[in-house]
Amino acid sequence: MTSTLKAEVDLHVHSLASGHAYSTINEIAAEAARRGLRGVAMTDHGPNMPAAPHPYHFECLYMIPDHLCGVRIFKGAETNIIGPGQVDLEDRLLEKMDLVLAGFHRHCGYGPSELQANTRAVLELMENPRIHIICHPGNPEYPLDYEAVARQAAATGTALELNNSSFVTSRVGSADNCRLIAKLCARFHSPVSLGSDAHIAQSVASFGHALDALNAAGIAPEQIVNRTLETTLDFLGMNT
């Protein structure tokens, strides 16, 4: 399918700091520039993930330049949901970041997965203005009431991520859920984000499958929060 949608910023990328990713921030920025991106978000895993960085890593994100290789660098985290409205980084650290993703992951402190409890956890998180994006919500290991989540996204302005990796290598069984989420987002005009979930530089800006799903669902361009650098800055409440 030919895509009529786009994203100038990749809002979900991991560096060596995540422990199971394989490129430096400089390598990622260089590849992002080569692929024509105007921005890339460094969203290494929160500390509850095995081999993830210590919280002090996130304390020191200010050391990263705002621009590398001509690409805007957004400094953030992919936090782990650990309970209703709870993630594995303190609010004082979340406040320091340009953006915060939140998602369910194995072995990270979340209890037994059940649709009602999972949905409650996400809906409460979306009330927190420090949480910008719910990442890979189509993961079948953590079922959700997708309609309730899409409605909440529209109400709170929290973006739901279409994660390209969910269609390819990760979270087997996610693809149909992601397509349904895209349709619900189109129905309720919920904000969506695109992320490669790259764990190596060569995967940065890989959006093809996610874009196809958004096109098929009838998502309007203005629903994609990272369609341009300017819309990304606006979504994150950043002026420059």
UniProtKB/Swiss-Prot annotation:
PANTHER family: PHOSPHATASE YCDX-RELATED. GO terms for cellular component: cytosol. InterPro entries: Phosphatase_YcdX_put, PHP_dom, PHP_phosphatase, Pol/His_phosphatase_N, Pol/histidinol_Pase-like. The lineage of its organism: Bacteria, Pseudomonadati, Thermodesulfobacteriota, Desulfuromonadia, Desulfuromonadales. Zn(2+) 3 binds at E78, H105, H136. It holds the Pfam family PHP. Zn(2+) 2 binds at H20, H45, H199. Binds 3 Zn(2+) ions per subunit. It comes from the Bacteria. Its EC number is 3.1.3.-. GO terms for molecular function: phosphoric ester hydrolase activity; zinc ion binding. Its cofactor is Zn(2+). The keyword Zinc applies. This is Probable phosphatase Pcar_2586. Keywords: Hydrolase, Metal-binding, Zinc. Zn(2+) 1 binds at H12, H14, E78, D197. Belongs to the PHP family. It comes from Syntrophotalea carbinolica (strain DSM 2380 / NBRC 103641 / GraBd1) (Pelobacter carbinolicus). GO terms for biological process: bacterial-type flagellum-dependent swarming motility. Signal peptide: none annotated. The keyword Lyase does not apply.
